[in-house]
Amino acid sequence: SATRAQLRGCREDDPMGGHDPYSSSKGACEIAISSWRRSFLPPENGRTIASARAGNVIGGGDWAKDRLIPDCIRALEKGRLAPMRNPGSVRPWQHVLEPLRGYLMLAKALWHAPADYAGGWNFGPGSVHTVGDVVNCLVEEYGAAGSEYTPENAAPHEAGLLVLDSTKAREKLGWKTVLDLRRSVALTADWYRRTRTESAAKICREELAEYIQICKKQTDMEKI
């Protein structure tokens, strides 16, 4: 069954750990950063460290193996069905530009007020979706045939529910995501589709410009 932290979302001050090596390695990294900060870079000295934890990011440029979007793109490009190993697993999906904006906001705040912004920070979406939701959106945006369930009986353990609580970033930095799942997947599909004939650098520049305009529009709407 899901723990209370999983249901409400993992916070920055929750105990570190993990059932599987992958999540345990994330916790170990945070513990190492925290100990280094306390030992050598206390905020009162004017220099310190903050760590950032993003949700499950998607976006163009990822070609790694055993990752959801790249595996699906490779299959769709070959005319196959998009594979889903754990369609019911819930993750905090977000476009890669969302946490990157948060990292820049955190870096700026840390530079001006080290003591106020040291520590760990979560940058996750306001809503979570299943693997199946993401794959179905991708198939629709890519104009492909469909998806298929491809279970791996010998696969390592993975948590079925992962949620991030980003209240701290929202309240102290004014950060929040501006893209919903559909728009995030659409941008991702568009990047992979266009790289067949266009420069990846050109697509990234155009995507970034579009994202900046979306952020500005969102900010203007909140002022009304």
Label the predicted regions.
Residues 1-56, 63-64:
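Catalytic helix-loop patch of NAD(P)-dependent Rossmann-fold dehydrogenases
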Residues 11, 39, 76-224:
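C-terminal substrate-binding subdomain of Rossmann-fold SDR/epimerase-dehydratase oxidoreductases
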Residues 27-34, 73, 101, 132:
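Conserved active-site helix of classical SDR/Rossmann-fold NAD(P)-dependent CH-OH oxidoreductases
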